[in-house]
């Protein structure tokens, strides 16, 4: 029944029944990902974490292939040059290598996943599989953050913030480069993503405000982890 919305019209209605159903499944699977180690502590072994990281990378690859081969999307729009896939890949590399810098990148870059789940770029789709993979890969980003904080006791560092901001600026430069050549809008930095934003003119002012706002948001995300007067991390350690 729910799939008929997609099969009959090719349209994915935001906040429709299908949107709610797919998002709910993705949230439940992501919650299960976080909660399973309480029942099965052996899942926290390094080899199992590495397998999870590889599996998540394959999920992302599956999303790209499904989009281009089954859903009729242009490969130009499926390359992982947005912030969300960069965060997901960083999280996967953290699970594989356990290097804190990758967790820091995941943490500071994952906030876009919430917007993607609420306002998915699925206004036109042909396969329900793509919609499920899209929602699941985005829901896994905050789940990986919670998993790492809760089970692996990972923490954010000032150096991690600096690397995340610098990395984001490099991603923005990369997006501008490929947007010009492919006609895409990676990082939403070459075209207005929403009509309401067209009031911000000239366009370079929008670009400057957009980049500045995301850098400021990363700084805000760092505040719970800043050292206290006693030199301890301010975030409560569970």
Curated annotation (Swiss-Prot):
GO cellular component, as recorded: plasma membrane
Membrane disposition: Multi-pass membrane protein
Compartments, as annotated in UniProt: Cell membrane
InterPro entries: CHP02206_TP0381
Alphabetized UniProt keyword annotations: Cell membrane, Membrane, Transmembrane, Transmembrane helix
Transmembrane residue ranges: 15-37, 50-69, 79-96, 101-118, 128-150, 163-183, 203-225
Top-level division of the source organism's lineage: Bacteria
Xref: NCBIfam families: intg_mem_TP0381 (TIGR02206)
Descriptive protein name: Uncharacterized protein TP_0381
Species annotation: Treponema pallidum (strain Nichols)
């Amino acid at each position: 029944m729910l799939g008929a919305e997609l099969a009959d019209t090719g349209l994915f209605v935001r906040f429709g029944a299908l949107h709610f159903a797919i998002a709910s499944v993705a949230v439940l699977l992501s919650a299960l990902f976080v909660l399973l180690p309480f029942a099965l502590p052996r899942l926290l072994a390094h080899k199992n974490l590495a397998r999870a990281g590889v599996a998540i990378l394959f999920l992302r690859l599956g999303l790209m292939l499904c989009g281009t081969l089954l859903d009729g999307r242009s490969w130009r729009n499926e390359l992982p040059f947005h912030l969300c896939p960069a965060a997901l890949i960083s999280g996967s590399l953290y699970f594989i290598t356990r290097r804190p810098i990758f967790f820091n990148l995941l943490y500071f870059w994952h906030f876009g996943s919430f917007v993607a789940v609420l306002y998915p770029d699925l206004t036109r789709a042909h396969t329900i599989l793509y919609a499920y993979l899209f929602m699941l890969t985005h829901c896994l980003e905050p789940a990986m953050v919670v998993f790492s904080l809760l089970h692996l006791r990972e923490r954010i560092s000032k150096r991690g913030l600096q690397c995340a901001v610098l990395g984001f600026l490099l991603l923005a430069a990369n997006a501008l480069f490929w947007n010009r050549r492919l006609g895409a809008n990676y990082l939403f930095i070459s075209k207005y993503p929403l009509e309401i934003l067209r009031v911000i003119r000239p366009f370079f002012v929008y670009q400057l405000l957009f980049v500045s706002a995301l850098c400021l948001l990363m700084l805000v995300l760092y505040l719970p982890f800043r050292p206290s007067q006693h030199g301890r991390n301010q975030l409560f350690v569970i």
